[in-house]
Structures are given as structure tokens and as C-alpha cells.
Design a protein with these regions (language model features):
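Switch/connector loops and helix/strand junctions flanking conserved nucleotide-binding motifs
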Residues: 16, 41, 64, 90-91
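Generic recognition of short, well-ordered alpha-helical segments
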Residues: 17-21, 67-68, 92-96
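Glycine-rich, highly charged phosphate/nucleotide-binding loops
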Residues: 60-70
Length: 109
């Protein structure tokens, strides 16, 4: 069974603004696609979450990262997509990940 790509909006400023739904999604994902592991790590540390695998997605890695994400989703993993701030797919390299998942017929939330 295929996994699911979960788009997770993150606070633009205050980490206290992170929704409960986002916290639940972050805690259940097998891996997280992110632009900057430092910023994502700060957010996860704030939530008391650790041990997540990161897939770095930026203008230099988005092609290879897209392929890796699709392979992992096809293997049944749940992968979260976060940005440094805001909703994934708006002014960030996550768009390619979303397009690859859709093209492969995978589930998105």
C-alpha cells in the first residue's frame, strides 16, 4: 500500500501558533521534507519531537529529493512536507515534490 504526502503549514513567526493538527501530523510522519534542517529541527525540538529523518528540498536538491520522496511513498511511508514558514508550495521548492506525488498517483493530505 502506498504512503501519503502530508502538507504541513508552519507558523510564520511564533512557534506557539502551530496548530494541534500540524503537531499530530509532524509526530506521525516517517520523514520530513524541509528546506532547512536547522529551522525544522528548532520547531521539532520546541515540540519535543526528535529522531525524524530529513529530506532536504531546495533549488539544488529538489530533483533528487522528488525521486526519493516518490520511492519512499510507494514503499508505504508517510512523509511530511514543511517550509521554513507558511504553507508548502507557496514560494518554495516543495512544488516539485507535490507535482511528482500527483503524477505518480499518490495520496496527498
Amino acid at each position: 500500500m502506498s504512503g501519503t504526502l502530508v502538507l504541513i503549514a508552519t507558523p510564520i513567526g511564533n512557534l506557539g501558533d502551530l496548530s494541534q493538527r500540524a503537531v499530530e501530523a509532524l509526530s506521525t510522519c516517517d520523514a520530513l521534507c524541509c528546506e532547512d534542517t536547522r529551522r525544522t529541527g528548532l520547531m521539532l525540538n520546541h515540540l519535543g519531537l526528535s529522531g525524524k529523518t530529513y529530506i532536504v528540498v531546495n533549488e539544488h536538491t529538489e530533483h533528487d529529493a522528488s525521486r526519493e520522496v516518490v520511492e519512499r511513498l510507494l514503499a508505504g511511508e508517510t512523509i511530511g512536507l514543511v517550509t521554513d514558514a507558511g504553507t508548502p508550495g507557496i514560494s518554495d521548492p516543495g512544488e516539485r515534490i507535490v507535482r511528482a506525488a500527483i503524477a505518480s498517483g499518490l495520496s496527498l493530505i
